[in-house]
Amino acid sequence: METRNAVSKDVLAGELEEARERTRLLLKSVSEEDLVTQHDQIMSPLIWDYGHIGNYEELWLLQKSHGKVLSKRELYDMYDASLHPREERPSLNLLDRKDAELYLDAVRKAVLETLEDADLGDGKDPLLKDGFVYNMIVQHEYQHNESMLQTLQLKKGEGYKPESRVELPAGGAVEEEMVPVPGGEFVMGTDDHARALDNERNAHVVDLPGFLIDATPVTNEAYLRFVEDGGYERPEFWSAAGWEYIKEERISAPKHWYQPEPHSWWTERFGFDEPLDPAAPVVHVSW
């Protein structure tokens, strides 16, 4: 076995494991009821995401890459996002937590076994070359971690307390003056085959006019000034479609913001109420 392949395989196996640890940590404190409930019509039940993670891994790292199949056709169909829109997924005969964990473990065991003999060199298989398909699966699992967090933010009832969390360092002063970026040519995209998806390739030169940009994301404090200055009542700040949406939905502030009393702003975060953090980046403003 080549040293380059052996090292890359160790890295790939470690990244697959790290992604799985995050997924399980994310779901560990979620109740069985919350796991199977569809908390919003635009989201899947969490248990569907969990099973889909394993089935997608089987599809790409076993079936398509090595011609190995563990599951019956019914399981592939059940976790195929193109066959079942989100409104259908709660009615499917989904794996429960225990069976999903057993399934994910079985898939991962087979994946690591086939990884040992996989040719990640300059072979003819574009999926295996440089470990592309393994990196794709790691990214896919993290994408569903994000979807799960969206679901947990949208769910009602008992608040979500993660098993553990990383405390962020205290922020410093925010520079509100915009930074000028001179125009000119720059390289957009990448030629990296191992980790970039097709919509990120290939590298190409783009000529961009000069522009101004904030040095940091817009903070809650800055956006609150826009809200209190009547920004949601002035159509000149919005596109036609955005203004129509604001009027139809009667939106007057970012989602989850509310005022328990005048001049006091709070937000609901994963089911818990907390004062609006002025230094945090504003979120939930897209339509």
Where are these predicted regions, by residue range?
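Extended beta-strand/loop cores of jelly-roll/beta-sandwich
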Residues: E2, V7, V11-A19, R24-V30, ...
